[in-house]
Structure formats: structure tokens, C-alpha cells
From Swiss-Prot:
The modification Phosphoserine is found at S122, S600. It comes from Mustela putorius furo. Residues 1-305, 394-404, 462-476, 569-654 are cytoplasmic. It catalyses: K(+)(in) = K(+)(out). The lineage of its organism: Eukaryota, Metazoa, Chordata, Craniata, Vertebrata. Residues 630-641 have a biased composition (Basic and acidic residues). Residues 39-146, 630-654 are annotated as: Disordered. It is a multi-pass membrane protein. Gene3D superfamilies: 1.10.287.70, Potassium Channel Kv1.1, Chain A, Potassium channel, voltage dependent, Kv1.4, tandem inactivation domain, Voltage-gated potassium channels. Chain C. Pfam families: BTB_2, Ion_trans, K_channel_TID. Belongs to the potassium channel family. A (Shaker) (TC 1.A.1.2) subfamily. Kv1.4/KCNA4 sub-subfamily. GO terms for molecular function: delayed rectifier potassium channel activity; potassium ion binding; voltage-gated monoatomic ion channel activity involved in regulation of presynaptic membrane potential; voltage-gated potassium channel activity. This is Potassium voltage-gated channel subfamily A member 4. Detectable in brain, atrium, left and right ventricle, and kidney, but not in skeletal muscle, endothelial cells, aorta, and liver.
Amino acid sequence: MEVAMVSAESSGCNSHMPYGYAAQARARERERLAHSRAAAAAAVAAATAAVEGSGGSGGGSHHHHQSRGACTSHDPQGGRGSRRRRRQRPEKKKAHHRQSSFPHCSDLMPSGSEEKILRELSEEEEEEEDEEEEEEEGRFYYSEDDHGDECSYTDLLPQDDGGGGGYSSVRYSDCCERVVINVSGLRFETQMKTLAQFPETLLGDPEKRTQYFDPLRNEYFFDRNRPSFDAILYYYQSGGRLKRPVNVPFDIFTEEVKFYQLGEEALLKFREDEGFVREEEDRALPENEFKKQIWLLFEYPESSSPARGIAIVSVLVILISIVIFCLETLPEFRDDRDLIMALSAGGHSGLLNDTSAPHLENSGHTIFNDPFFIVETVCIVWFSFEFVVRCFACPSQALFFKNIMNIIDIVSILPYFITLGTDLAQQQGGGNGQQQQAMSFAILRIIRLVRVFRIFKLSRHSKGLQILGHTLRASMRELGLLIFFLFIGVILFSSAVYFAEADEPTTHFQSIPDAFWWAVVTMTTVGYGDMKPITVGGKIVGSLCAIAGVLTIALPVPVIVSNFNYFYHRETENEEQTQLTQNAVSCPYLPSNLLKKFRSSTSSSLGDKSEYLEMEEGVKESLCAKEGKCQGKGDDSETDKNNCSNAKAVETDV
């Protein structure tokens, strides 16, 4: 492995290797080439001397040998199109072979073809020696094409055809090079082409992973969670399938996925496979600066102090509206309000008694001077103002009206205007009959009931309600299964208890639909007791119904609880991360760009030695580290001394 990597680096193929290690490899390669040239020159000189000593055409032979010597010394830099890497041969061995071979060639062949014969004999000897060296080195050698653009590895594998031995040559491209990854002492080995499938990730990008390379051990070292890396490596091997090991917690594996930079798409798909919904993307802010400030003021209470004040006012108005909605249903307030509404409708036949009607008519009470109506009007004015302002400043009208919270705002406002329009129409049109008045009262009661949805407006300012909403959205499939199982159980046990109680004259189950209520109450383990079986068969059916209800409800509950825990812990971690980011460094004299870089770091460590050095340099260059500030003057305030102490403490930690 090391031989292949060194050879490839000498030709400029292994761009993923660190610069220092590559420079050492190139130096060793240049030294090897220098020894090869010296050995070749010595061998040619010895062969030339032997030929001249034996007689013959010495001048022409000397001229040819000199030419070949020059060519041989220049060949490693650009002579052949395909060169084979071999080890350094002893100089005496080469000299011996050439002295024993060249004299015979000069005796047998004419001087004009002597150079050709010498070259053939020399190449045959070199090929034989190369084959022996390849067998000793594991039958592995390196080759490069004419232009140096493509690096490849050739492996001689034994043939399995039963023909008595032999080897077959197999060529591998540069990406098939094997790479060793050490994760906290556990070594993994894979091919470079496997990691290159995802070039944007930490392991797939040569520049990103270079900082973790250990040149002494020729491997990449990561001080990370070991069980998680099995799934990380499988992500590359499988082409993008990310599966969490059962022995790794969800939050730890999520941190590992973020560290290896597998991407947001892979992380979102992994969370979906785990049963969680996609996180909502942050909505873009308006481009206009004025609209942006208004949007932050009404939409994000944590953005500023005025925004928190507006949020508090909104919560108080919502609570007042809900309290008024509940108080107006009390008997002492409900009777007077119904009478006022009847008078506003233009008559009081059938609705007003003889004592209350003259009193209300003489006092001039109408729906418009009712205290509950006045308070309700004030609340609606605030809700309408808030809704219109947010609609004006929103970055996208389409997304604004698709938001469930904005739909709740519209539903909570509309009943007031419908009620107001109905009252005005009745006052102008006068009484149109008792039947029409009764219908108007029924419609108004339904519309007033819709106001109860205002309580969901609190979820805009409550993290707990938001977590509950996310949990229900993530558990829609489980809730659907629960309702489906309950529906099947209600049908089965309602039919069974009806036929079990059919012969009992005093039974409560007169029909199967009458038994639906009993089945629902029994399966949910509520048990009001208003309907109960009397016969033995009915009691047996009731027992089975209760057991089936417990099992049906218990099955999807763990999934719902798991979703709630996930969203709750995620919200808690976000709050802790925000606090740690805001309180990263307490010394006010540190450079702002240094603090910004430190706070923007998503990892628990700065990760690189250069960043540590930059941190240390920034602390030293800060005002706190100056001797004149920390030591010079005696009239420094206590705050300055504390800041200087903090700066020195930070410098020591770095």
C-alpha cells in the first residue's frame, strides 16, 4: 500500500495526501532515480571497456554505447511512454551481467547491428528481474500513461484455469486505491472510489479530510463515536442509505451525521425514516427594511424588548376574551343578555316576562351598550389590528394564509362581525316573527361557540403548545390507526352485546346503534355506568370489550410519547445552544471577528490547530492583553481589572 501511494505521489496523482508527506515521497523518488542513472552509466562504461578490450570495431561501438548511455540517463524523465517501477539493483550485479553478455554479441554480430542486440538482451534481463521483484513485492507494480494524466495500478493475480500456474494482469484506476480510516482506535479500510461518490462530504472531499491525515501511520484518524461509523461507512458503500445502529442514541448519531457533513437532505431523510416529521424551514424575512422590523416585532417575540411587550399584550387580550366568553354563560348574566338580544331583534313575545321586559325597555339597554359586548369589541379591535399588520408585513401572502395559526386568527375574528351584522339587520328590519327570531338565536349561539378557538392563539406564544402540535402532526398515522381500531371494536362489541341482551326485557340495548355509546365508553375505559349489560353473556362481552380497548389504546401510545420526547428535547437543546452561543466569551475586549467565528462554530471544538493559533493570537492582540491596560496604571477601575483577568484566563485555556 505504501509503495503504491509513494509512486503515485511522485507522478502527481495522489492529490489527497498532505503536502509534507508528499514532499518526502518525491525526495525519495528523486534519490532512487539518481542511483538508477549512476548504475546505468557505470554498467554501460564497463560494457564498453570490455568490448574495446576484445578487439573489433571499437570506435563505432564506443560511439553507439555513448549514445545509449545518454539515452538511458535521460529516459526516466520522458523517454518511454510506459515505465515500470522497480527497486534499486546493486551496481556489481548489473556490471557482471553486461560484461558477460556484450563480448559474445561483438564476436557474433557485425558492428552495425550490435546496438540492437545489446538493447534486446538488456531488456530481456530487466524484464526477468522485474518479474522476480514483482513476485517478491506481492506481484504489484505501478504505471503511468504517456501524458501523465491517468494513474493506474496493475496487479498480477494467479489464474484459476487449471493450466498449471501463470498470472493474469489486472489494471485498477486511481480511485480504487485503498484508504485506512482510524476511528478512536478502530480501523476501517475502504476504497477511494467509495468515498468519492459523495464529494461534498467530509470523507469524500480530499481538502476537507486532509487535516485528519496521520503521515506516520498513513491513515486518517477521527476521535469520534466508533459504533456510529459503521453506519457512516455503509452510507458511502450503499450509495446513500443511512441507517442508525440500534446501540447508538438518536442524538449522538445525529451529531455524527453533522460532523461528517453528509448533508441536510440525508439528515432529513434519516429523521423521516425514524418516524419524525420534517422540520419547518425558517421563513424568509421581508426585503423591505420597514416591513422587516414590523414582521420581527409581531412574529418573533424573542427578537427585541418591544416585541416581547407586544407578545405580553396579545396574551392578556386573549385571556380576557376567553374569560368573557365563559362569564357570559353564567345564569345571572345569560338571562339578561338573552333578553337584550330579544329586544334588539324587535320584540319580546315568548321570550320576555312581564316584570323584566318593561324594566329593560325603560332603561334603554341594547346589545351595543352591553358590558360584555364592549369588552368583546375592544378585544376584536386588537385582534384585527394585529392580523392586518402581520398580513401587511409578511414576506409571502400565499404562505401567510396557508399557515394554520393565521387561519385560527381569522376564525376567531369572523364570529364578532357576523353577530354584529345580524344585530344591525334585525334592528333595522324590526320583528319578523317568533320562528325567525328563534332561528337567529340558534345561528348566533353556533357562531359564538366558534370563539372558543381563540384559545389556540396562545400557541403562538407557548412553546408547550407548539410541541404538542408538532407531536400530533408527527403522530397522525398512529392516531388514524387508533381511530380505525376503535371503530372496528365498536362495531363488533356493539353487535355482540345487542344479541347477548336481546332476550332481556329490561335491557338498555334496544338496538345496535344504541350500543355504540356503551362500546366507546367501555373501550376507552371510562365507564359512565348509564348503560350496562345484565345477562351473563352480556357481561362476558363487556369484559372482552374492556380488554380489547386497553390493548388497542396501548399500541400506538409509545410512538406518540417518543415523538413528544423528540420535539421536547430538540426545543431544550436549541435553547441551551442559544444560551451557550450568546455567553461564549465574557471578556468585552476580545476582537469582534474572533467572537463571531467562535460563536458560529457548530462543533464542540475548534477542530484545527490553525484555529487554536488564531484564537490565541486574537487574545494576545486584544486590548485586555496589553501590558499598559492590565498592569500600567494604578487608577484602573475594578471592571477593567476583572476584564484583564478574564482575558488572561481565556489565553491560558487556549
